[in-house]
């Protein structure tokens, strides 16, 4: 008899498990990990917009400016802004026949 039929055998009009070693530490650890995984998955699905928005905008703050003189910071800001302005001014016009 296979393990599958042994586990899924009806016991007293209910579906049950015939394993007697369910207090095994490995089984307990697997159950805890499974429950934590389910909780984290549910939280991820509920709050995925907040979570991913935080990571998306939180990681785009740019390089650290700690220890950099203010004049160099201002120069860097101007370079970044001029690069953004240059990108905004280039548009391609496509006409379909």
Curated annotation (Swiss-Prot):
Glycosylated residues (UniProt): 20
Regulation (activators, inhibitors): The M2 protein from most influenza A strains is inhibited by amantadine and rimantadine, resulting in viral uncoating incapacity. Emergence of amantadine-resistant variants is usually rapid.
Site (Seems to be involved in pH gating): 41
Subcellular location: Virion membrane; Host apical cell membrane
Superkingdom in the source lineage: Viruses
Annotated region (Disordered), positions in chain: 60-88
Keywords: Disulfide bond, Glycoprotein, Host cell membrane, Host membrane, Host-virus interaction, Hydrogen ion transport, Inhibition of host autophagy by virus, Ion channel, Ion transport, Lipoprotein, Membrane, Palmitate, Phosphoprotein, Signal-anchor, Transmembrane, Transmembrane helix, Transport, Viral ion channel, Virion
GO molecular function, one term: proton transmembrane transporter activity
Biased composition (Basic and acidic residues): 71-80
Residues with Phosphoserine modification: 64, 82, 93
Intravirion side: 44-97
UniProt record, GO biological process: protein complex oligomerization; symbiont genome entry into host cell via pore formation in plasma membrane; symbiont-mediated suppression of host autophagy
Site (Essential for channel activity, possibly by being protonated during channel activation, and by forming the channel gate and the selective filter): 37
Side of membrane Virion surface, spans: 1-22
Cellular component GO terms, alphabetical: host cell plasma membrane; membrane; virion membrane
Function: Forms a proton-selective ion channel that is necessary for the efficient release of the viral genome during virus entry. After attaching to the cell surface, the virion enters the cell by endocytosis. Acidification of the endosome triggers M2 ion channel activity.
The family this protein is said to belong to: Belongs to the influenza viruses matrix protein M2 family.
Record protein name field: Matrix protein 2
Organism: Influenza A virus (strain A/Singapore/1/1957 H2N2)
